[in-house]
A protein has these predicted regions:
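Nucleotide/phosphate-binding catalytic cleft detector across ATP-hydrolyzing
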Residues: 1-153, 161-278, 285-312, 317-352
């Protein structure tokens, strides 16, 4: 019987599972609900997300990952076990599982991911550098001696890398991504209009109204929240121009990190990037005007990958068949092989 392989994008906002043959087969929010009276997990994924802003005081809503790193091991284990079992419930044999992790992850942080995935019943576990997975999922020919640059903007972090001959040459990770834009928008609305809005409303503003460039778009949305002046429900109309300042401030931090990576890239590879441009992946890449803003800051063409939300998950699944061609950015993390790797080098993705 054919070996069953799955790839997991263990994201701060969503967990996405894919196979090379079928593409994305499962997606759920990375969130769980705990009844603090009994310390039991009562809901995960979509069921827990519906409780945001509406749950009683004894229900604790937990987002177990922050900036792509596990913060709550118990909830992470629960999510992975439930979701993997959902995908593999009709399978007799244990799957091989590849999981993407941030480019700058430490050995200790990676070990926590390995432990959680092994707990879900994996036969073997492989870790994939997130920018490498994004490039594979976007269809880039990363095995060639040609430099390509990927900026993967997820929920918790933005991973940036220049890749050539199957591995990353230069990389950086910055804790500015989709969730940071949501928090920034909520804080700005509160300070400017004296209205407190919830995270779901802030996310809706980001998707429907926010833009990184002044002249590219003008949208409008009425928001409802809690007035800080009257302590009563309130509403206010928000325009794109109202959000330009906070959104561009965060976008400039992504641009600065991308510029630093590009400036430290060897000249020949930098010339390749100048010729082929930069590819954006991840849900954060869909922020209106971000691609054109980055193009102006980096002085190279910037494009959004087709189906950017699923590039990392799809590439993670593909890595299981392409792993032997990847010089760095792919590691057998099954405990015996993994501990040997960590003993030899603290960087989980350093070359042999």
């Amino acid at each position: 019987m054919k070996q069953y392989d799955i790839g997991i994008d263990l994201g701060t906002t969503s967990i996405i599972i894919a196979t090379e043959e079928q593409g994305v087969v499962f997606r759920q929010p990375t969130i769980g609900a705990v009844d603090t009276r009994s310390n039991t997990i009562i809901a995960v994924g979509d069921d827990a997300l519906q409780m945001v802003g509406r749950a009683p005081a004894y229900i604790d809503l937990v987002r177990p990952l922050r900036d792509g790193v596990i913060q709550d091991h118990r909830m992470t284990n629960e999510l992975i076990v439930r979701f993997v079992n959902e995908v593999c419930r009709s399978r007799i044999f244990k799957p091989r599982i590849a999981v993407c992790v941030p480019a700058q992850i430490t050995g200790v942080e990676a070990d926590a991911v390995v432990e959680s995935v092994m707990g879900a019943g994996a036969k073997q576990v492989f870790l994939v550098d997130e920018p490498v997975a994004a490039a594979l999922g976007a269809g880039l020919q990363i095995r060639e001696p040609h430099g390509c640059m990927v900026v993967d903007i997820g929920g918790g972090s933005t991973d940036i890398a220049v890749i050539s001959m199957g591995g990353r040459v230069k990389a950086a990770s910055v804790p500015v991504a989709g969730n940071a834009f949501d928090r920034c928008i909520a804080q700005y609305v509160q300070e400017k209009f004296q209205i407190a809005i919830g995270p779901l409303t802030a996310e809706a503003l980001k998707k429907q109204v926010a833009c990184c460039t002044k002249s590219e778009f003008e949208g409008v949305m009425e928001v409802r929240g809690h007035s800080w002046e009257t302590n009563l429900p309130a509403r206010h109309v928000i325009y794109t121009r109202d959000l330009y300042e906070p959104v561009q401030e965060l976008a400039s931090r992504i641009a600065a990190s991308a510029r630093a990576v590009l400036e430290s890239t060897p000249p020949e590879l930098a010339a390749d990037v100048s010729s082929s441009g930069v590819l954006l992946t991840g849900g954060g890449s869909l922020l209106r005007g971000l691609a054109s803003y980055l193009a102006g800051e980096l002085h190279v063409d910037v494009a959004i990958a087709p189906d950017p939300l699923n590039c990392v998950a799809r590439g993670t699944a593909i890595s299981l068949s392409e792993g032997r061609y990847l010089t760095a950015g792919f590691r057998d993390a099954t405990p015996k092989a993994w501990h040997k790797c960590l003993q030899n080098n603290h960087d989980p993705f350093a070359g042999e």
